[in-house]
Design a protein with these regions (language model features):
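Ligand-binding pocket scaffold of soluble enzyme catalytic domains
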Residues: 1-184
Length: 184
């Protein structure tokens, strides 16, 4: 595979980390998500995508838990991705951005969690692609997770999933300004 020397990670936290650092929940977003899982997204001015679940007195109670949500590696909301400047070329990565995997995303999240001083997460939760990240956490870093809550996900795609995603890919490529993905 390819290697990125360093990367930026955009993230948000909600609630307070307790003194023992045992109340942290990592929320992993789906493909079209971002770090704004709760409260108002400052860019869209809309409620976070899981605002109904995360907050004071809600299912993931931020009066009890410290919630961390990062934009994944390769995302487009502040973490290093195709729109980022490649330090070697001083231009956007664009199509030259390395192919990344769920495992790569989770390795970056683990570095973030460690940088926050958290040795073991109370839980990791995510749906769809976020659920795949949750499963990766449960296998790769099982010693750093108490509870894994994968939602609407699988450890691999079915033929139907692959076909569905191909339809989406074809729709993007049919856009008149597609330019073979060369946006930069």
């Amino acid at each position: 595979g390819e290697y990125i020397d360093s990367c930026e990670v955009a993230f948000k936290t909600f609630g307070e980390l307790n003194k023992k650092k045992t109340n942290a929940i990592l929320v992993c977003h789906a493909l079209s998500g971002d770090q704004f899982c709760s409260e108002i997204n400052p860019l869209t001015k809309k409620n976070g995508w899981w605002n109904i679940l995360i907050g004071p007195g809600k299912v993931i109670d931020t009066n009890v838990f410290f919630v961390v949500c990062s934009n994944v590696l390769g995302g487009c909301m502040g973490s290093t991705g195709p729109s980022s400047i490649n330090p070697k070329t001083k231009t956007n990565y664009g199509l030259k951005f390395p192919v990344i995997t769920i495992s790569d995303m989770v390795k970056v999240q683990e570095k973030l969690v460690s940088a926050l001083g958290i040795k073991k997460l109370f839980a990791v939760i995510g749906g769809s692609m976020g659920g795949m990240q949750t499963l990766e956490w449960a296998t790769r870093f099982s010693n750093k997770v108490n509870v894994a809550i994968p939602i609407a996900t699988s450890y691999r795609h079915s033929a139907q999933n692959i076909a569905f995603h191909e339809i989406g890919r074809q729709a993007i490529m049919a856009d008149p300004v597609w330019n073979k993905g060369n946006y930069y």
